[in-house]
Amino acid sequence: FDLVRDHDLECEAEQSGWIQPAHSPGRFKAISEKRYRQWEKHGADVELLDKADLESRIGTNFFFGGFGNKTGGHVNPLALTRELARAAAENGAVIYERSPAMSYTEEGDGWRVTTPAGNIRSRALVVATNAYTGEAAPALAPRLARSVMPITSWQLATAPLSDNVRSTVVPDRQAISDTHGDLHFFRYDARNRLITG
């Protein structure tokens, strides 16, 4: 959130906390308690929530306790991406769209990136392929190719919820993501819709 504040990024940022509820008693012991101790040891503003504490925070008794980070929160990811591009451009970065990198090599004190339209020289290089790493990795970053794991995802949003409903379901608007391997999450957006996936 420091980056959001430092560059005045308009991305619906809400630093209202993050809670990770445990979907089973075993996950509470193995993940919530362990993560709490690890983060607390490093000075993070965290809390361990038992089942009753968690129910009062998120409005369901489905979970078995959890872990909370009071400095966490959530953003609109598309708005954040656009704002990061804006801030980067305002600070001298040049963004090349629709120009896939075919290869790159270190050259002097920088990099040469080869694209179908020609070469680009830069002082810094970031390989940021996101969902397309699997397609790009063998040529661009062979070490990344072994780290690619397919993930399926979906999202849906409710209609804007009334104050009455919001007072019982995550009333403090924290970001929630559980301990499933294929995690489930929910958060409110700026229009008071509950986003889940």
Locations of regions flagged by a protein language model:
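Rossmann-like flavin
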Residues: 1-87
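Active-site substrate-recognition segment that forms the wall
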Residues: 3-14, 101-103, 109, 113-114, ...
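General structural feature for long, well-ordered alpha-helical segments within catalytic domains
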Residues: 31-35, 80, 84, 97, ...
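Conserved active-site and cofactor/substrate-binding residues in soluble primary-metabolism enzymes
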Residues: 49, 75, 79, 96-99, ...
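A conserved short coil-to-beta-strand element within the FAD-binding core of flavoproteins
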Residues: 49-60, 94-111
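Secondary-structure boundary elements
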Residues: 86-96, 191
